């Protein structure tokens, strides 16, 4: 494979995020990189793709800056670019938790668990494993026995915790996310909220899956990623499929966005059912006048109506 995908973050002071972002974007474009990077006064959060040569130059460029000299990159091999464009954007936060009183992970955060320590925590009955990601990420893949917060945005996680404290009180809490950045801030919030014995998987799922000792054990399904790949493997020992097809409940790991642009919900759908149900998550979305699947495939009004009739045979929840 000639391409690589880099995933990284660091909480570090960046005095002028706007200027940094503009200069960084220029460097990335000059080296044919594509991806998404967020920059704020609290640090940097990025994922990008490029050839081995170009990503090596990027890593070298970052390590030459004293602020990022110890920056750790998680690296995946890839067959092509994982992004269509290159964006470097200044933001208020590099991961949006939107707290009234912001958390600085450099001052307060949960204990770091190595992959080996995290595996032991998974085997400990007195430890609660809390997924810090969104529900659609969990539904594609998660650690065995982990709690699934019913959220679609990271910023909703604190409210979920407050409403479900009984699941966490009196337990050791270890949280995890894709690459570790969300847990840095979220675990610090848990500590500030008064929870004791709070930990986090250092380096996230991405690091755990590549660890030569743990080999991704106890992970079921695939890991959702925010790029063109959609998902990647984690468990090197006993792979399983846990995702369930939106319409018929069969094993599925194929995510699409609902064809209704006003919905855009991510659903697990087979190619057959995407065609059958017009790329939509529900009857109402399938009949939406701006259905993108209908437009993309130049479906006639007669054929559109014929496929809408397919919804008569599916569970009631898809008619909402």
Swiss-Prot record:
Residues 123-217 form the Rhodanese domain. The keyword tRNA processing applies. InterPro entries: Rhodanese-like_dom, Rhodanese-like_dom_sf, Rhodanese_C, TrhO, TRHO_N. GO terms for molecular function: oxidoreductase activity, acting on paired donors, with incorporation or reduction of molecular oxygen. The keyword tRNA processing applies. PROSITE patterns: RHODANESE_3. This is tRNA uridine(34) hydroxylase. One of its GO terms (biological process) is tRNA modification. Gene3D superfamilies: 3.30.70.100, Rhodanese-like domain (3.40.250.10). CDD domains: RHOD_YceA. It comes from Staphylococcus epidermidis (strain ATCC 12228 / FDA PCI 1200). Keywords: Oxidoreductase, tRNA processing. Its EC number is 1.14.-.-. Catalyzes oxygen-dependent 5-hydroxyuridine (ho5U) modification at position 34 in tRNAs. The active site is at residue 177. Belongs to the TrhO family. It catalyses: uridine(34) in tRNA + AH2 + O2 = 5-hydroxyuridine(34) in tRNA + A + H2O.
